[in-house]
Amino acid sequence: MSKSVCSKDLYCIFLKVTSKRYSALSLSEVSPIELSHDSISRWLENTHCQPKDFWSAAAPHVRETKGVIIADETILNKSRSEKIKLVRWQYSGTEHNIVRGIGMLNFLWVDEKEEICPMDLRIYEPKEDGKTKNDHFRELLRIAKRREVNPEAVIADSWYSSLDNLKMIRDLGWNWVMGLRKNRSVNKKEKLENLTIPDEGLRVHLRGYGFIHVFRFEAKNGRTNYIGTNVEDPTREKIKSLVRKRWEIEVFHRELKQTCGLEHCQSRTGRARRNHIVLSVLSWIKSADVRRNNHLSFYQQQWNVIKQAIAQQLKYELAIV
């Protein structure tokens, strides 16, 4: 039995450089120190990784740059998983259907150069903690305020545009730019979809909140999106540029899943899965730092990892021809 113990650094670097296999067995096969896959699995189940582990890396960048908070969730697909902790049936905006998976709410900092930095996350597990997605959203807002974050705006889709959320953001002294459902009541029992909204936006009274500005945007697929904001005297171009930043969190989620093994934890325990999720984000942060410091594209970074192994294999096979 191996007496060595896995570490956060080793696990994160493994997730960063591997591209196909993310299991404890795979790590044990390539680890520079002797580790059995059982010892790695036990370590993953017993260690305690928390989202605050990556706030220490994010804090300097968030506090020194101007930017916005982007909030959105992603579903870790577990359609073939049964009797595994954290997995539940829930609605997926990507699939537009109910799917089995793990719900993950992320807060992301996007600065003026559109460089992104993970700030915090929560796992949606209502049977364990009794919290809704909006409860988690407000909790993350309070934590961000305690950490002295000062965003230009908080940006999210219509799922998080409840009155309680909007009022909290306002009370924290921040602006918000949120999607609004087409049947949202404004003015005297009018629906957004029934209003004539000019390109420069329309000032309306949001029931239970107060006066806001609303903009109407047509998506390429023909869908009409309504965006509300408490920004004073907003222009269409300004709101459009802020909403466009929401795309960065979609890129972040895709990279997490495709390159950091976010969905590939094989453990059945909730603690191990939580640890794996946090460590996946930490590995993404390490990868992003390398790209930024060395001026590498995402694809250059991937190629740098595998090209040495390919070169060695070429030498080996040519030698035996």
Describe each region flagged by the PLM.
Residues S31, L44, E73-I75, S158-Y160, ...:
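Short, flexible loop/turn elements at secondary-structure junctions
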Residues W43-H61, D135-F137, Y226-E232:
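Short, motif-level signal for alpha-helix interfacial/capping segments enriched in acidic residues
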Residues M1-C49:
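Gly/serine-rich nucleotide phosphate-binding loop at the start of the catalytic core
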Residues V30, H61-E64, R147, D171-L172:
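Alpha-helix C-cap/termination motif
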Residues S23, F54, G67-I69, G103, ...:
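Generic hydrophobic, aliphatic-rich segments that mediate packing or membrane embedding
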Residues I13, N46-K113:
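Active-site-proximal, Lys/Arg-enriched surface segment
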Residues S2-S4, K8-C12, T18-K20, R80-E82, ...:
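Single, function-defining residue in the core of a domain
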Residues L27, F107, L282:
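Residue-level signal for inorganic ion chemistry
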